[in-house]
């Protein structure tokens, strides 16, 4: 990423990459609706205003205050008498939510800033990852060692997953051919994205040479992260009460979302 590029151009590129990522998003329909609303009118002026605010070091307190959580049922425990009978007529209150899907509700302007942060600093962090780290890897140009131009930021996850799995099977077959014993363990870290804690010092600009726009993007990105994690912390604190409330709600089962802004 050209650090000397005009901030207006960088914002447009970040917005384009954000839109491209949402094209493949199948779960977070709320975010897709946010993008539709954002693009409904005066989109060019909105991007210009965002670039000017970043360049001038303006406050984003109003947007930061709007950060919250968006909850959907992930796993439902049914108490129906006969699980082999499928019907569209049953009592919602006889079902219990066992697990939740938790999404962050963040204004589109801040999503653009987050993408801009990845564009400016992501390649430096990606270099530090082991070659066997497969998820959420950036598309890096081998010659420039920077993020490639284009609409996309990350390598498609399903392709990375297939490659990881195929290599594991190939290695297992190789060991078997050499008369070695093989045991394949497939482990999954439960609630990883809800549990991981990142220290600000782990996300430093490795160059240590910051221009004003980079400083603004960096500081704002930290605030986005901190405000989002604060919402998660509050949710964890009240989870017992929340589960009780969810058990009493039937509307959340229907095709509507239930946003919670903390």
Q: Predicted regions: what is each one?
A:
Residues 97-133, 240-262:
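Conserved pre-motif C helix in the palm subdomain of viral-like polymerases
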Residues 1-93, 97:
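Non-catalytic, polymerase-adjacent accessory regions of viral genome-replication enzymes
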Residues 74-76, 108-110, 188-193:
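Short, flexible loop/turn elements at secondary-structure junctions
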Residues 81, 85, 89-102, 162-176:
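Short linear interaction motifs
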Residues 170-262:
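Conserved polymerase palm-domain catalytic core
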């Amino acid at each position: 990423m050209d650090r000397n590029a005009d901030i207006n151009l960088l914002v447009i590129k970040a917005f384009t990459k954000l839109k491209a990522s949402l094209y493949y998003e199948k779960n977070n329909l709320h975010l897709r609706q946010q993008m539709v609303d954002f693009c409904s009118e005066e989109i060019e002026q909105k991007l210009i205003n965002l670039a000017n605010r970043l360049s001038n070091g303006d406050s984003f307190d109003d947007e930061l205050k709007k950060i919250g959580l968006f909850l959907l049922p992930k796993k439902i425990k049914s108490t129906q008498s006969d699980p082999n009978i499928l019907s569209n007529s049953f009592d919602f209150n006889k079902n219990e939510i066992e697990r939740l899907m938790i999404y962050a509700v963040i204004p589109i302007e801040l999503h653009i800033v987050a993408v801009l942060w990845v564009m400016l600093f992501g390649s430096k962090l990606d270099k530090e990852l082991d070659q066997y780290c497969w998820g959420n890897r950036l598309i890096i140009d081998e010659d420039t060692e920077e993020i490639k131009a284009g609409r996309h930021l990350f390598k498609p996850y399903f392709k990375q997953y297939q490659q990881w799995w195929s290599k594991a099977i190939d290695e297992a077959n190789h060991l078997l051919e050499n008369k070695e014993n093989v045991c394949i363990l497939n482990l999954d870290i439960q609630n990883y994205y809800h549990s991981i804690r990142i220290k600000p010092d782990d996300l430093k600009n490795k160059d240590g040479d910051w221009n004003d726009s980079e400083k603004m993007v960096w500081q704002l990105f930290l605030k986005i992260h901190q405000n989002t994690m604060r919402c998660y912390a509050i949710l964890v604190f009240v989870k017992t009460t929340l589960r009780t409330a969810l058990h009493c709600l039937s509307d959340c089962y229907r095709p509507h979302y239930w946003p919670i802004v903390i």
